[in-house]
A protein has these predicted regions:
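Short active-site loop/helix that positions an aromatic residue
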Residues: 90-93
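Conserved phosphotransfer cores of two-component systems
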Residues: 96-98
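Alpha-helix capping/helix-boundary segments
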Residues: 3, 87-88
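Conserved nucleotide-cofactor-binding alpha/beta core module
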Residues: 112-113
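Glycine-rich, positively charged N-terminal anion/phosphate-binding segment
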Residues: 25-44
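Surface-exposed amphipathic alpha-helical tracts and adjacent flexible/coil segments at the periphery
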Residues: 5-9, 14-21, 40, 46-56, ...
Length: 337
């Protein structure tokens, strides 16, 4: 919940999260159903949407459990399902037809034809593959019948999202089952080289300097990867992207804060600008924590607002009589005047 609060308090319009099963970050501290209810209430009172990630491949023997997950989440009021498995798309439409379906980046949709096919299946938003250059994103946005979302900040896979089998082959932990062991972040040696090189580790993506261009393309939503990051990271990155998206120019202080809170020897825009190569690679370096930056980030979500409570108002009006106004919250507390 701290990371969720950090996102909301720093300007997120929507948050995406997962339950303990059926999501691509099963190693994270995911939400229970009770915590999901708390998250939905917290976000909806503040005008923020909750998107539930069910973004792995699901086997036949798991479909009953997945169906129950979809049903309960819909009852709790989630605003969208983020889905990879085509079978789950049909299941979501059957069980919760009023909840929008977003095609996960794990679907590897990288062309207009893929977007059109997803739209035919009933998907209302497509999260494009991270590897697309700006020209192809713009072309898809101009011709897409559904909303387009792209990742603008966070970790990049060495392989195309949803198409990597390295973790499964090396450690029997499939990335398409939410269990990626991140072997691309490990050192590898070969020949006369010692095992001190990281030939598969990409720097994190950072497109903060391109936000106005991305908006002009018609991208409906920008996405920040942060589900296994500290709340302070979520706070800092969300705050900066919100400010720039609202029209403030990017500053050197912004770029410094983004790099300080987490980076892998800087950032890359290689896929977006179409300049792939050796400059995209880097590793995370342990550096002393910036105490002022971390303290400010924590304060933004720990002391960012007065508590809010969702309430319902009732008016009782009778001709020739006094009027009554009643208010009640979702826990049964109320007042009348």
């Amino acid at each position: 919940m701290d990371a969720l609060r950090a996102a909301v308090q720093n300007g997120a319009d929507a948050v995406y999260l997962g339950l303990s099963a059926f999501n691509a970050r099963r190693g994270a501290k995911n939400f229970t159903l009770e915590e999901l209810q708390e998250a939905v209430t917290y976000c909806h009172v503040r005008g923020v949407q909750v998107h539930l990630a069910i973004n792995i491949l699901v086997s036949d023997r798991e479909m009953l459990e997945a169906s129950e997950c979809i049903r309960r989440a819909a009852q709790l009021g989630v605003d969208a399902f983020i889905v990879q498995d085509l079978g789950l798309v049909a299941l979501c439409k059957s069980i919760a037809p009023d909840v929008p379906i977003h095609a996960s980046t794990q679907m590897s949709i990288h062309s207009l034809e893929g977007v059109l096919e997803a739209a035919q299946m009933g998907v209302s938003r497509v999260v494009l593959a991270r590897e697309l250059p700006r020209e192809e994103i713009a072309f898809i946005c101009r011709n897409s019948p559904v909303e387009i979302e792209i990742f603008v900040h966070g970790a990049l896979c060495m392989c195309y999202s949803g198409q990597c089998y390295l973790s499964s082959v090396i450690g029997r932990r499939s990335g398409n089952r939410g269990q990626c062991a991140q072997p691309c972040r490990m050192p590898y040696g070969f020949g006369r080289f010692e095992e001190s090189r990281y030939p598969l580790s990409l720097k994190d993506n950072c497109l903060v300097e391109y936000l106005q261009e991305i908006r002009a393309m018609g991208v409906a939503s920008i996405k920040i990867e942060g589900r296994m990051k500290r709340p302070e990271y979520v706070a800092v990155v969300t705050r900066i992207y919100r400010a720039v998206l609202s029209g403030r120019p990017v500053t050197q202080a912004d770029l410094a804060d983004l790099e300080t809170i987490f980076s892998r020897q800087g950032f890359t825009q290689g896929y977006y600008v179409g300049r792939t190569g050796e400059a995209m690679f880097g590793t995370h370096q342990d550096t002393p924590e910036d105490r002022d930056l971390m303290a400010g980030a924590r304060a933004s979500y720990e002391r960012g607002e007065n508590p809010r409570v969702g309430v319902t108002f009732y008016a009782m009006l009778r001709s020739g009589e006094g009027s009554q106004l009643a208010v009640e919250d979702d826990r049964g507390h109320g007042a009348r005047t």
